[in-house]
């Protein structure tokens, strides 16, 4: 089922969700960090630093810096690929799944509050 939003409603939804996250969450993620987290959870694995860098059109060091933060928050984990030591595999964590479940609930809640 497609959801129809006017541009002003979509922007208000983004504003309200982000405002709540900044005010209430201990984990203040950047747009890049959130995009990486959502990519790892919503798209089928495997996920690698190289693959994420290509998908997001950013450098591998930029992905690595974001993963340092996300790993420190225990939202994602990473390990060397045993088959190819050059690759680093990015994996999901329980804390990351819980964070995104909360985020999904928050988006749904704020969408219901939008003026019609």
Which residues make up each language-model segment?
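N-terminal helix-turn-helix DNA-binding core of bacterial DNA-binding proteins
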Residues: 19-58
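Amphipathic alpha-helical dimerization/coiled-coil segments
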Residues: 21, 101-116
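Basic, amphipathic "hinge/linker" alpha-helix immediately C-terminal to the N-terminal HTH DNA-binding motif
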Residues: 83-101
């Amino acid at each position: 089922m497609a959801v129809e939003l006017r541009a002003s409603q979509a922007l208000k939804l983004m504003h309200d969700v982000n405002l709540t996250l900044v005010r209430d969450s201990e984990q203040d993620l950047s747009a890049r960090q959130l995009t990486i987290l959502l990519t790892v959870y919503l798209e089928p694995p495997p996920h690698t630093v190289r693959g994420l860098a290509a998908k997001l059109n950013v450098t591998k060091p930029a992905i690595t810096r974001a993963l340092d933060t996300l790993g420190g928050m225990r939202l994602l984990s990473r390990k060397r690929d045993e088959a190819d030591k050059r690759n680093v595999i990015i994996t999901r964590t329980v804390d990351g799944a819980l964070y995104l479940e909360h985020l999904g609930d928050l988006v749904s809640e704020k969408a219901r509050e939008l003026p019609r």
